[in-house]
Amino acid sequence: FLVDAVEPSEAMRAQASSIPGVTWHAGVAEETTLPDAAFDIVVFAQSWHWVDHERAGVEAARILAPGGVLGIVWNQMDVSIPWVHRLTRIMRSGDVHRPDRPPTPGGGFAPMRLTQVAWQDVMTPEQILTLGTTRSSYIRSSEAGRERMQANLRWYLYEHLGYAPGQDIAIPYTTLVWRAEREGA
């Protein structure tokens, strides 16, 4: 299969440019400049929160071929598990997408259908501390806020949960895969 990907960041396009089978386009979800009815599937992976849902849905409907499918994917820590929920609260990681709240794109799509997949990512406490530094709340925070979050994470992982440095921790994740067909397609 071939992939056409739309990315507004020149740096991100450059970083991903070596991925085989992908043609990168400068643009945004609301105005892709891609041709009408040219794609069987349009997917937003970890990006739906960045777009205007109405306009991005209308644009997806425009570029989808008849019978085309819109997909919206979220990978997130499984916050239904209490210790994971607390971990995400400390990291302020935004793992808040719920199965009972389907996305609402514009563009005349049939109701969203959900497939949910559980999986685990094995990480050490040190890798979780690094993961915390990738969250937008950390990046936007003051130095004092960053230090506080890292200190809270160290306390939670090492003292409260009792993990040792370098020890493997199986982090439960859930992937929410929403899909909808164009109405009347």
List the model feature ranges, each with a label:
Residues 30-42:
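A short acidic, Gly/Pro-enriched loop at the edge of an enzyme's catalytic core
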Residues 40-54:
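A short SAM/SAH-binding and catalytic strip from SAM-dependent methyltransferases
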